[in-house]
Amino acid sequence: MKIDSVLKMSKIDYNAARAVFENYLNSYDRKNDKVWLKIVHTYGVVAESTELAKRLRLGEEDASLARIIALLHDIGRFEQLKRYDSFMPDTMDHASFGVHILFREGVIRQFVPEDTWDGIIETAIARHSDFVLEGVTEERVLLHARIIRDADKLDNCRVKLTDDLMTFMGADAGKIGSTAISEKIRKDALEGKSILSADRVTLMDYWVSYLAYFYDLNFRESLDIVEENDYVRRIIHRIPYTEPNTKKTMEELEKRLVRYVHEAKKV
């Protein structure tokens, strides 16, 4: 994939990188609802990364680096949608493919002329969608891996509140709320565990898994953003739960998550 470079400066320059990104998007159908959702999401993650960098009191270079990582974190999604018209993980590992585009095809140089930060950027993007973040030991790399994971989840709160359910769930609110929650999903969520993608079966399993994202947030500052925006209650109450056991579980989960978000101590 060739992108005409508009970068001339040897530093982290977000505005120039954004111009390259906009040019990259010209290869895809912006009118496609799923593509547009991911474009909006990308810039939402940039905004959340910027806010986290501010709250974490990062220096200028790390703040700029966080924004660049956010801009590029889902670059593999667009090719996934072009080929498969799907976000499902069984169609493509979008994080790995994003790394392939950037670092195997050399596209990263179009966004960041210097290779100084390649190791940080590559690891953060490669690991941003891992079920659990493990094996990253270098302090600065770990910082940015945590920031992008949290920023991604924080913007996904906006997605779950405002985007068309048919676009990312394939069903309307009534149908989602009428389905059961699998026992393993119910148990894991109420025990404070993240949900493994492969364990999800029903529509409600998927919905619960999005709420269980909160358990995986790394920073107290991220949980503060969740609490300030009342994301737990607002996301839960977007769906009318008509299946009796589902309704009961969601009431329990709401109480547990509200308490967790308020009390949890993080890095």
Question: Language-model features: where?
Answer:
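Acidic/His-rich, divalent-metal-binding segments that scaffold phosphate/diphosphate chemistry
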Residues: 1-96, 138
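Alpha-helix boundary/interfacial micro-motifs
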Residues: 66, 90-91, 123, 163, ...
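Divalent metal-dependent phosphate-bond-processing catalytic cores, especially two-metal-ion Mg2+/Mn2+ enzymes
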Residues: 2-8, 34-39, 43, 47, ...
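Short low-complexity stretches enriched in small and charged residues
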Residues: 2, 20-27, 78-82, 105-115, ...
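Hydrophobic/aromatic-rich structural module bridging two neighboring secondary-structure elements via a short loop
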Residues: 78-119, 131
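Alpha-helical scaffolds flanking conserved acidic
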Residues: 58-71, 115-124, 141-147
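RNase III-family endoribonuclease catalytic core
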Residues: 121-129, 133
